[in-house]
Curated annotation (Swiss-Prot):
InterPro entries, alphabetized: Ribosomal_uS19 (IPR002222), Ribosomal_uS19_bac-type (IPR005732), Ribosomal_uS19_CS (IPR020934), Ribosomal_uS19_SF (IPR023575)
Protein name: Small ribosomal subunit protein uS19
Parts forming coiled coils: none
GO CC terms of this entry: cytoplasm; small ribosomal subunit
Family in the record: Belongs to the universal ribosomal protein uS19 family.
Record's keyword terms, sorted: Ribonucleoprotein, Ribosomal protein, RNA-binding, rRNA-binding
GO molecular function: rRNA binding; structural constituent of ribosome
Function: Protein S19 forms a complex with S13 that binds strongly to the 16S ribosomal RNA.
Leader peptide range in chain numbering: none
Organism: Ehrlichia canis (strain Jake)
Length: 93
């Protein structure tokens, strides 16, 4: 079920504080580390780089205009795909 039209997009207040602080100090090239994977990417985040925590490390995410409206967690995978193991039978010639 999608979010109600009456509600604004969710973005954690501490993420907004960190963005406003970085813009005020003119640190647009620095990485802003966040844990809030459920926050929606807003228009004011375009051009900034965020370090989104995936449970182990901070994955750098450079925000562009195609990402607006999506969540930070979509760009920071938490699971590692190891692939299917090949057949271990020895082939005879």
């Amino acid at each position: 079920m999608s979010r109600s039209i009456k509600k604004p997009p969710f973005c954690a207040p501490h993420v907004l504080r960190l963005v406003n602080k970085a813009v005020a100090q003119n640190k647009l090239n620095s990485i802003i580390n966040i844990h809030s994977r459920s926050s929606v990417i807003l228009n004011k985040f375009i051009g900034l780089t965020f370090g989104v925590y995936n449970g182990k490390t901070y994955v750098p995410v450079k925000v562009n205009d195609n990402m607006v409206g999506r969540k930070f967690g979509e760009f920071s995978p938490t699971r590692r795909y190891t692939g299917h193991v090949g057949d271990k039978k020895v082939s005879r010639k």
